[in-house]
Amino acid sequence: MDEETPSICEQCLTDADLRMTRAARGAECKICTLPFTLYHFKPPGAPRVTKTLVCRRCAAQRNVCQCCMLDLAWKLPVALRDELVSLVQGSDERTPEASNEMVRRFLALRGGQLGGARLTADSAPLRELMGKMRAVAAAAAPAARAHGGREDAGEVPETQLPFGGALATPASRSFFIYGVDPALPEWELVDAVSQLVRTPDWRDAGSVSVVVRQDARCAGIRFRREELAQAFVARLETLPAAAGAPKGVLRIRHLRMHVVAWPEFHLAAFGETKQQTEGIARLATKTMRADAEGASPARPAAPASAAGKVAKKAAAPRRQGRRGPRPTLEL
């Protein structure tokens, strides 16, 4: 299957006549870890090269793009898509993701489709699913009108987002991340958190555990155990705040984001309209600027040198000035 045309969405490809470079067994799949045929290319005007991250087999199983790993039908992250499908179908449609490498390879080699991809990858089940979603939306519309709804579609739900929160909150397994770069993909955030807590099996399988909203410059993560959340907090840099509530600093490549605890983690807080997400993005940028003006991040102290000595070279003695006159030789 790797020898076939790669499965890449229009947003990543941008041009059907784009020139690609193909490397057989050029990388390991981010999901099954098996070697696969790597494709990389540079879209017109893009600042960097785009490459495939997962193999064709794993992408087909989940009905996702090999580059951005978003659902090909809905352009949503897999976890969010499966959650929506589960709500509409009334059954558990989550994609099984094994933590064991051998099980991941077994799932990849078994073939078939997983989770919500069983419905979104085929046109007939997708039409039926969309019909159910329209029926649910039509039934919910009168109730929304009865409650008055939002008078201002551009209102930003600031009270639902903990921009003024702190990093260390007892018994919190969820965190709010703001200052997210619009070009940061979800998989890269997941990888960065996995490296910090030193395990890829940190997500809560019982709910949506990772949400990245690049348009709102925010994200949310939820750990499955409190011990993992504490390990995450312990390995972050800290940013002291003026009010005495320190925040965390998460660095991915050259990007820097701020982290606070968010016990009330929920999807609706990220906004429902374009005006709301734009307002949240402005608020995130403003808060990042205010945080930077208030304090600079404190990094872990560097290890002391042996015997507590200062690791500085002794200053070399200054050279003397010009030499005096040479002594006269008497013959």
Swiss-Prot record:
One of its GO terms (biological process) is mRNA splicing, via spliceosome. InterPro entries: Cwc2/Slt11, Slt11_RRM, STL11/RBM22-like_N. One of its GO terms (cellular component) is Prp19 complex. Associated with the spliceosome. Belongs to the SLT11 family. Involved in pre-mRNA splicing. Facilitates the cooperative formation of U2/U6 helix II in association with stem II in the spliceosome. Binds to RNA. This is Pre-mRNA-splicing factor SLT11. It comes from Eremothecium gossypii (strain ATCC 10895 / CBS 109.51 / FGSC 9923 / NRRL Y-1056) (Yeast).
